[in-house]
Amino acid sequence: MPSYNAAKFIAASIQSVIDQTYSNWELLITDDCSKDDTVKIVEKFIVEDNRIKLFSTGKNSGPACARNKSLENATGKYIAFLDSDDIWVSNKLETQIQFMIEKNIAFSFSSYSVIKEDGTPTGNTINVPRIIGYHGYLRNTIIGCLTVIIDREKTGNFIMPNIKSSQDMALWLLIMKRGFKAYGLQNTLACYRLVSTSNTSKKWKAAKDVWKVYREIEHINPIYSAICFIGYAINAIIKRL
């Protein structure tokens, strides 16, 4: 879990991990030099639960660096992702890991609901396909980072590309290029929080960052990039209906 000035929401995010029906977890939080009470809040949880560990980037470096610090210190075979303002449903880990074991798969994700900044439901649920591969994902970035679990004993070790935005998209594509598809559970296992920064300008920036992933990370030619981007834009609109 990366954190930066997350004092308003991080307690709820941490509590959603503590409340999991699956108990064999470790929560690795890397703080990116927060200026609020984020660290103090995390430290209070650590006193009560030694499965929670806190690291620091040392200097403000962005979410990719924070996530990678946690990845470097993770000891488990399953890697799950959660941002400091989002929430897991209590049976998320148990349900998803059992699904992965039964299907013998390396990369899974799930449907998730969207909540308002105050935690109340918006009524919007993002429903996911049962399976998606590299070319499908280029056109439909449907995978919510907060829902992903990866078996790194199957995929091999990985880090998030150190880019300013869309690091998760770039990582999923990297893993897919290793020959793995992502398998979706229709169960709604997480809640994505819409915060005040989730505005039109941020969405426009996210769209530009997706284009950068096509051209600068994946090195896709302009024509195919345009085709993929049209698919991305259409699916982004559908996702918000």
Question: Language-model segments: what does each one mean?
Answer:
Residues I79:
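Short aromatic/hydrophobic "clamp" motif used to bind/position activated sugar donors
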Residues S16, S23, D31-K40, K59, ...:
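A conserved acidic beta->alpha catalytic loop
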Residues E72, N124-K205, D209, V213:
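Conserved nucleotide-sugar donor-binding catalytic segment
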Residues A6-D19:
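Short, well-formed alpha-helical segments that are part of the catalytic scaffolds
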Residues F9-A11, C33-K44, I87, N91:
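Acidic helix N-cap motif at the loop->helix transition within catalytic regions
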Residues N91-T122:
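Conserved donor NDP-sugar-binding/catalytic core segment of glycosyltransferases
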Residues T57-A74, T95:
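Glycine-rich, basic loop-to-helix element that forms the pyrophosphate-binding segment
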Residues D83-I87, S111:
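The conserved acidic donor/metal-binding loop of glycosyltransferases
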